[in-house]
Amino acid sequence: MISPDRIKEIANSKPTGIFNATGGAELGVTAASATAITVDEIMDLFYSLKSPYRKNAIFVMNDATVKAIRKLKDGNGQYLWQPSISAGQPDTILNRPVKTSAYVPTIAAGAKSIAFGDFGYYWVADRQGRSFQRLNELFAATGQVGFKASQRVDGKLILAEAIKVLQQKA
């Protein structure tokens, strides 16, 4: 499972983000509106993902998108959003977990506002071990010692069909 601190890398183009036009996730559905999402579009996104990937799939979106979706109801007047009733369990949409990240684009014209899929197919690889450098002189005047650390990582969605995105109308 992808940790929340990796979402920023995954959502954006560092290294190869899921919302990138090249190397990113496949388009699952285009919303009819530039500023809203419907229950039908979420259903279409859900079923645009092939069945084998739905088993481990999660929804990833921005808090503002979550707010909009929490207001949606199905044809029977039931809210699509199902808050978790168990401590430590995530909220769900269509019985799939929902994760939020400030790094996923909000609902706006042309934005890819929701990702749904099996994020196990996004691989993050450590390119080399961490390196640490002790900085004795930098803080010598205050009697402190500083440290500088670096690590090289790379990531890529290795199977584009494992994650689908919902894109707002341009």
Q: Whereabouts are the PLM-identified features?
A:
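Sequence/fold signature of self-assembling virion shell proteins
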Residues: 75-170
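A beta-strand-loop signature enriched in Asp, Gly, Thr, and Trp
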Residues: 22-92, 98
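Generic serine detector
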Residues: 3, 13, 24, 33, ...
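Alpha-helical scaffold segments that mediate packing/assembly in large oligomeric complexes
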Residues: 1-47, 165-170
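Residues at beta-strand starts and edge strands
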Residues: 7, 55, 143-145
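Generic detector of short, locally flexible boundary/turn motifs and exposed helical patches
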Residues: 20-28, 63-65, 109-115, 129-131
